[in-house]
């Protein structure tokens, strides 16, 4: 590489010469093209002048010398590049002076002509400077470009030494919770890296790659770190986007350098997060530099995974939440042999994750993590960690030394529905929201479904929601029975029905309930066979064109409409019969703004149904 001091020296020379050139330009000098000079005797000069061969002539009389003068001119045929300056010294007669005047020779005294000759000398110097500056500037520019390219080329090709420095993972399987099945599947990799001879004895071959598939935040990165930590292997962690650059060939170069380094430091674990950034399916329809760079990077990855065997003690872990976009060549045996699903944790998994993260925060002894786990279905490991962190922040904001159950409830509501917003609402607005939420809560209690229970009802706005009813499943639900789906439909309809019964009008607040109820009813009829049409799939799960004929599909739509109408009528009858309980729950909400599920069940028990059951 070119030393930087050489580059700086050349740059200084360039700037100095450029400054000199600028000075000549500012003083008004113009480069002269005169490159030769011809010396004649007086007679020859006068003959050339009388013949009209000279131009721009000057007669410079010498001081204290009668008639003696220096004669200067240029030959007319030498204009432009290579012009010749003609000089002579002669003692002129009056007739000769008159003849030169006829040829437009100027008469100067020695002082004025000396100044003119100084300007001419400066012009010649400026010409020389220009002849030097231009090639020197070009050379300096080329050298500078080479210096920058040599110095920074590594940033656009292979990974830097810092990026390829392996780390020793301090994570163990005890730090990873909520994915026991996934841990069991990848534990074979740990055993192989610890004792590869045992597998070679049976002729077995360990997978070269393991693809971790699951939604974001489920612990895929932690699982890969745990494998490296348990196997005492070097850990290389990169993202798929780290291989993507503007210039074609950069990604492939980085893949090769990564695998070369991993082999040198084996046993090694290479973890590529969001691997779909470089592993997505190739397409012949797409073209251009970006597609060419992607294809070259993917090809380099395929070749690299083919280029090592089990003896290299290098295993590649990839993580993605879009396995359907992966190129099939990358998923074939011999590359990513195994796919491990890392899904959202179940109730037991959520409890285990909460117990792991609870060690880093100060929970009050009254906090029941089992209840928190029940109240957080659908939460990932990252969501649960964030829940405890938000609870700690909420407790600190209220100057408490420990985290209470109410802090975690507030944190969960904030994560699910947004921050609490205190809006100024009229009495009428509060009544509408209170009856709407009271209808949801009461209908869930009346359904008799004990798997999902009302946990809390509030009319305090959060995010876009003006109020909400929170439900807690007693256990994880993996499928739904038809009675459970009917109960869900009626609970969704109860908000609108309560408004209509109590206030005599309806509002736009039920738009989300209508969409969810319609979706559930359509799934019951079109996908799950819960209609008189029987055991028949009428639509695809992805929502594409229907599988049935237009006539059959039209009949199915009529069954969807009938299912909604029937349950809307049943919901109206139930809430009309329990109008007293509905009014009492709504009044309690208007007074307290938030009530617990136990309060809803208590009020419903205290207000038996009326005799108007018809």
From Swiss-Prot:
EC number from the UniProt entry: 3.4.24.-
GO MF assignments: ATP binding; ATP hydrolysis activity; ATP-dependent peptidase activity; metalloendopeptidase activity; zinc ion binding
Gene name, Swiss-Prot/TrEMBL: ftsH
Transmembrane segments: 6-26, 128-148
Protein task: Acts as a processive, ATP-dependent zinc metallopeptidase for both cytoplasmic and membrane proteins. Plays a role in the quality control of integral membrane proteins.
Record-given protein name: ATP-dependent zinc metalloprotease FtsH
Pfam families, alphabetized: AAA, AAA_lid_3, Peptidase_M41
Cofactor dependence: Zn(2+)
Family annotation (SMART domains): AAA
A biological-process GO annotation: protein catabolic process
Membrane topology field: Multi-pass membrane protein
Primary location class: membrane
Oligomer and partners: Homohexamer.
Binding site for Zn(2+): 436, 440, 513
Keywords: ATP-binding, Cell inner membrane, Cell membrane, Hydrolase, Membrane, Metal-binding, Metalloprotease, Nucleotide-binding, Protease, Transmembrane, Transmembrane helix, Zinc
GO cellular component, one term: plasma membrane
């Amino acid at each position: 590489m070119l030393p930087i001091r050489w580059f700086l020296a050349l740059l200084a020379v360039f700037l100095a010469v450029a400054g000199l050139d600028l000075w000549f330009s500012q003083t008004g000098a113009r480069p002269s093209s005169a490159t030769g000079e011809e010396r004649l005797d007086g007679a020859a000069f006068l003959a050339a002048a009388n013949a009209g061969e000279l131009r721009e002539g000057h007669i410079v009389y010498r001081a204290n010398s009668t008639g003696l003068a220096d004669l200067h001119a240029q030959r007319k045929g030498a204009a432009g590049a290579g012009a010749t300056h003609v000089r002579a010294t002669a003692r002129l007669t009056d007739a000769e002076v008159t003849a030169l005047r006829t040829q437009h020779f100027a008469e100067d005294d020695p002082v004025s002509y000396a100044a003119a000759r100084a300007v001419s000398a400066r012009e010649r110097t400026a010409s020389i400077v220009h002849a030097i500056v231009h090639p020197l500037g070009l050379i300096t520019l080329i050298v500078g470009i080479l210096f920058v390219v040599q110095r920074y080329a590594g940033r656009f090709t292979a990974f830097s030494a810092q990026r390829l420095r392996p780390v020793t993972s301090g994570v163990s399987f005890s730090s990873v919770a909520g994915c026991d099945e996934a841990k069991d599947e990848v534990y074979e990799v740990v055993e192989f890296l610890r004792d590869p001879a045992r597998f070679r004895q049976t002729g077995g071959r360990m997978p070269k790659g393991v693809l971790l598939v699951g939604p974001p935040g489920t612990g895929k990165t932690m699982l890969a770190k745990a494998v490296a930590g348990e196997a005492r292997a070097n850990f290389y962690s990169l993202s798929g986007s780290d291989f993507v650059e503007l210039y074609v060939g950069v990604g492939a170069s980085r893949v090769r350098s990564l695998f070369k380094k991993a082999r040198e430091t084996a046993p090694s674990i290479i973890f590529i997060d969001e691997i779909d950034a470089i592993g997505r399916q190739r397409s012949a329809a797409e073209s251009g530099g970006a597609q060419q760079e992607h294809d070259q990077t993917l090809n380099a990855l395929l070749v690299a995974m083919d280029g090592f065997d089990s003896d290299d003690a290098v295993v590649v872990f990839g993580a993605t939440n879009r396995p359907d976009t992966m190129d099939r060549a990358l998923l074939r045996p011999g590359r990513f042999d195994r796919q491990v699903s890392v899904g959202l944790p179940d109730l037991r998994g959520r409890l285990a994750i909460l117990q792991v993260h609870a060690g880093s925060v100060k929970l009050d002894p009254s906090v029941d993590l089992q209840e928190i786990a029940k109240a957080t279905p659908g939460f990932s490991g990252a969501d649960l960690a964030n829940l405890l962190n938000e609870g700690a922040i909420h407790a600190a904001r209220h100057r408490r030394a420990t985290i209470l159950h109410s802090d975690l409830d507030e944190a969960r509501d904030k994560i699910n529905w947004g921050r609490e917003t205190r809006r100024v609402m009229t009495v009428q607005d509060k009544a509408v929201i209170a009856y709407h939420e009271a209808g949801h809560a009461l209908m869930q209690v009346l359904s008799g479904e004990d798997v999902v229970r009302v946990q809390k009802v509030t009319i305090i706005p959060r995010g876009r929601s003006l109020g909400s009813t929170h439900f807690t499943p007693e256990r994880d639900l993996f499928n739904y029975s038809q009675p459970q789906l009917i109960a869900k439909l009626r609970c969704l309809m109860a908000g609108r029905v309560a408004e209509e019964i109590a206030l005599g009008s309806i509002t736009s607040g039920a738009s989300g309930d209508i969409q969810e109820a319609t979706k559930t009813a359509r799934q019951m009829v079109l996908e799950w066979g819960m209609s008189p049409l029987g055991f028949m799939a009428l639509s695809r799960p992805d929502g594409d064109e229907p599988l049935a004929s237009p006539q059959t599909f039209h009949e199915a739509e009529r069954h969807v409409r009938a299912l909604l109408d029937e349950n809307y009528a049943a919901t109206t009858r139930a809430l009309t019969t329990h109008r007293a309980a509905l009014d009492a729950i709504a009044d309690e909400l208007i007074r307290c703004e938030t009530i617990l599920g136990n309060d809803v069940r208590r009020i419903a028990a205290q207000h038996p149904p009326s005799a108007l059951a018809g």
